[in-house]
Amino acid sequence: MIIRSITPADQEQLLLLEEELHDNEGKEHRAILEEALGSKETISLLAEQAGDAVAYLLATEDQPLKGNLIVLRLAVRPAFQGQGYGSILIAALKDLAVQKEKEAIWIDCSEDLLSYFSQQGFRDEAESDRGIHMVWER
């Protein structure tokens, strides 16, 4: 497995990954992906197995609070879920946050992912219109 930054050449594979997820927010995630890949402020991480994209993470710097990162999207191809790819990408983002001297990483998640992100060291901070607002602080 290789963890690397996403390049424009990866976009089609990532859009196919989003289609495989079959969630109701596919169009929203496609728009997030396209916008994020066009921004120089985006942190993008790709987990690649045998040349195939199996998971990716997008994050950006919080504009009002420059010392924080916000996870925009974490997606794992269904056939690879439960195998640690999401955890590896989150760990890589934490390492980057420490290197870049960021204070915290924020993510909004649905209630069914609360225990997953708690296991990754995030804590429940508040509820928002986008789900449960969670934070990891270094």
Question: Where are the predicted features?
Answer:
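Short beta-strand-to-coil "C-cap" segments at the C-terminal boundary of structured domains/repeats
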Residues: 134-138
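Conserved acetyl-CoA pyrophosphate-binding loop and the N-cap/start of the following alpha-helix
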Residues: 80, 84-92
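Acetyl-CoA-dependent GNAT
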Residues: 5-67, 72, 77
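Short acidic/glycine-enriched loop/turn segments that link adjacent beta-strands
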Residues: 65-66, 128-132
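Extreme N-terminal starter segment of soluble prokaryotic enzymes
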Residues: 1-3
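Conserved GNAT acetyl-CoA-binding A-motif
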Residues: 97-109
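Conserved active-site alpha-helix within GNAT-family acetyltransferase domains
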Residues: 99, 111-130
